[in-house]
């Protein structure tokens, strides 16, 4: 007997939510480490010159974490992603866009290349950086799959 599966094999929406929560946890660890070692955000484009804590609270974030306002937006989008229908889709799309922003932020940050250089390698900092890169990639992947699944479900329901 052949039955139609209503649930996809991969629950991409839940994967996106869990990955986003882990990204927030990693941002918290990164913030504590950056404040302890005074690693403010330094990019070729935007540099405030503020200490790490002040940069986290009011600037571009630290070398190891996004700014506070992006963490708050991430939390709000996670809560939205739990909702059904279009509010949930707003959360999913928003988290996917944040994944892209976080990934770009890691590659623009000059500290990323410094800590991954064998001469200036710093294990705790490198772990936070690599974890954020992996989590941002997962946020993008889960987000795209969740959007495609939602569109497919919406099209099937319209038939």
Language-model features, listed with the residues they occupy:
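Hydrophobic alpha-helical transmembrane segments
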Residues: 57-73, 130-141
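Membrane-interface helix-boundary signature
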Residues: 5-19, 84-91, 121-128
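Helical transmembrane-bundle signal
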Residues: 19-34, 74-77, 95, 99-109, ...
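Hydrophobic transmembrane helix segments
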Residues: 21-68
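Alpha-helical transmembrane segments of multi-pass integral membrane proteins
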Residues: 110-159
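Juxtamembrane helix-break-helix junctions at the cytosolic face
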Residues: 73-96, 149-151
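Interfacial non-cytosolic loop connecting adjacent transmembrane helices
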Residues: 42-61, 107-131
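Cytosolic juxtamembrane helix and N-cap/initiation of the first transmembrane helix
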Residues: 1-36, 145-155
């Amino acid at each position: 007997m052949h039955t139609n599966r209503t649930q996809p094999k991969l629950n991409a929406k839940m994967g996106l939510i869990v990955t986003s929560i882990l990204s927030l946890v990693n941002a918290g660890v990164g913030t504590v480490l950056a404040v302890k070692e005074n690693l403010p955000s330094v990019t070729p484009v935007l540099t405030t010159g503020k200490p790490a804590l002040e940069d986290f609270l009011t600037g571009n974030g630290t070398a190891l974490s996004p700014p506070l306002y992006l963490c708050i937006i991430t939390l709000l989008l996670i809560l939205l992603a739990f909702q059904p229908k279009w509010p949930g889709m707003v959360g999913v799309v928003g988290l996917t866009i944040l994944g892209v922003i976080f990934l770009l932020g890691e590659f623009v940050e000059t500290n990323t290349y410094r800590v991954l250089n064998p001469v200036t390698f710093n294990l705790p900092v490198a772990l936070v950086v690599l974890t954020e890169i992996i989590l941002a990639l997962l946020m993008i992947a889960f987000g795209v799959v969740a959007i495609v699944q939602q569109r497919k479900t919406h099209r099937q329901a319209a038939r």
